[in-house]
């Protein structure tokens, strides 16, 4: 394998049963993706502005053949064993799918390697192929650029493949390595082979005359010295195309060129696209190794609202076809040739930076389960869950159905949890704040939680949700703190202020906090897709964190009266939550479930959550005499979600630290199950039998579970597991936190689920990007660009190396003895102070004495560090307090 800084942990090596569900996404942020399976198949071709889970692009594949003295030694598809269902998967088409055998496009029926070993360390995948009958050793490395703070190069619509072949025999061998690609989604292709300097390019365009948003192009690019090309595979019916291609490939000699002057008149009876092949020949002496590179690039420039429902109340109206928008990548590269050649020409630099990021994570002192959680979820950023709009803005689904997105609109009560963009690509995260304040804010100040496309085309009809609404304010503070730009805050401060005031506004129909008590009392929509009523710590702590953040921002915006008002309201609310909602073990909801009158102020005709029932029918049960879908005395995993956000943003304690710690321990003790075999779950099943997991909510002994509790309560969500684990680690409960992470990752080991696809309400579910909080929780990263301060307090004492990404740069910090070395590997970082708890004695920076104020080392000036720079701090002694 290439690029191995140290021995690879076995958990990242996938063989045999653990290889079965591996599907590793390749592509850029907002470009869609294609995935590489654990056996080397190209699948999940989600590149045409919508998901295509478990879908092939015709019979696209890599293949290799070996010849000697004009005779064929062997020819194999560059795949390992077929691991799909032998009877076929369900399909909407007749004469296809279940009951019709293994998918033909998987090439299960074409000779391939006996075995394969997959190594997945995001953003790089590596495969070794094994077959005693093949003369040579074959490896494949695949990646797409993924470089923190470099969002342009990380948004390239490309997948890059390097195939290495070693002749391990005692005689010369002629090898041919070929890439066959289908002209995806095209009925009648136009394939053009050109050479640009050292690059050979097969460009796939279309003669189709359908709607503009369905058009696009792809390219194969290589720089091999001896290149062969088959512009078109045979146009025929039945199995002619693949049959003749393999017949012509699996024989000695060069490939037969084939061109057609006219577009295809009739489509294949099995709806196969047209195909083309580019191959590189190389003669290798005994013991010689050669690497051949291929780029696959794509360009489907226009997105459209394919999911649009004209009959949905509150939806914008339009005539004719749904509106379209241009993808960001299409504003940067004119077509697939432009993006592919750009990536190819800069391959070495892009790979070096991508591998540097990978090695900084995998070479760190983070526990392997945390590395695995981050490794397994960052691929969501390059999946079809994300769209990057023409101006560079991020817009997202919650997850993905097989052929379309799941739950549109950058849903704030789900996107609240993801922490990856804010740390690795903060400029992209800021676009989420900017668009929600610019396009989601109602005249009343409320923030709707789903964003319509195109931007500015209307509001979601459900209105604000409490967790998402206050999350926007907390995260605006986080973005300002990490950016350090008062002008940015000033631009959005009027929106933030109005959002805070919405809590007590008479125009708020949900009557959250009309008396400014610091507690949410009214109707509170939330991420369980229904509403809570009455005081509860979950949503009130979100309110408290938002009030605390608003108080600080108001002072910075020269609004001291509002700052004091927010501070005082928060103080009252905090006292109430600790006094009235903490039961000695955890925080609960305060509501008399038998009091029907608690609902009557909110029976105003607006629908209940996601239900179509009338409000009272949705929330009141005559049979049980009880308000439905509440938490009541339950121990909710999310019960102090606002404190988690506050800890991440550096807002301090919202509640009693002792109570917070006790509540976190209770969540672990009550909600974590080492085995779910005896657990009853009538909801969606994301963990089962002997698997371990953290439940959303439980009702401990001595409490009463509502007859009809909050939806999903019995489920296990990995996004909540990562959140809770990081919060436990933040608060010093490291073993408990790691136990939860291990459980989540054990379920995603490849044998039952894809390690790179955490599911919830669909595939590549964005809540799972809460996993990135584990990185900062364990390293104890503290960063505030406003004062140029960075610091670390690792969860475990002793020497270590930790990844960081902050400001406009990223790198590692090395802690060794009494020496702290801050290393920048990409971007730049401007710092004035270094905070390291546990310091004692004198301090020097790069050999020069500096002042120290407790845990804070005062560097004396702004230090701007760029890639390759390091800051070395020596102290008399260092050990975490």
Map each language-model feature to its residues.
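Acidic/polar, glycine-enriched structural segments that form the non-catalytic walls/loops
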Residues: 1-8, 13-16, 22, 126, ...
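Substrate-binding groove/exosite segments of carbohydrate-active enzymes
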Residues: 12-57, 256-275, 281, 288, ...
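Acidic-aromatic substrate-binding/catalytic surfaces of carbohydrate-active enzymes
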Residues: 29-105, 208-257, 327-330, 334-337
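Primarily extracytoplasmic ectodomains and periplasmic/lumenal surface modules that are beta-strand-rich
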Residues: 29-33, 39-44, 71, 170-174, ...
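Non-catalytic C-terminal accessory modules of carbohydrate-active enzymes
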Residues: 41-43, 49-53, 57-72, 76-77, ...
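Hydrophobic, small-residue-rich alpha-helical packing segments that form membrane-like cores
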Residues: 517-557, 565-576
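Carbohydrate-active enzyme catalytic cores, enriched for enzymes
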Residues: 554-557, 569-677, 766-847, 851-856, ...
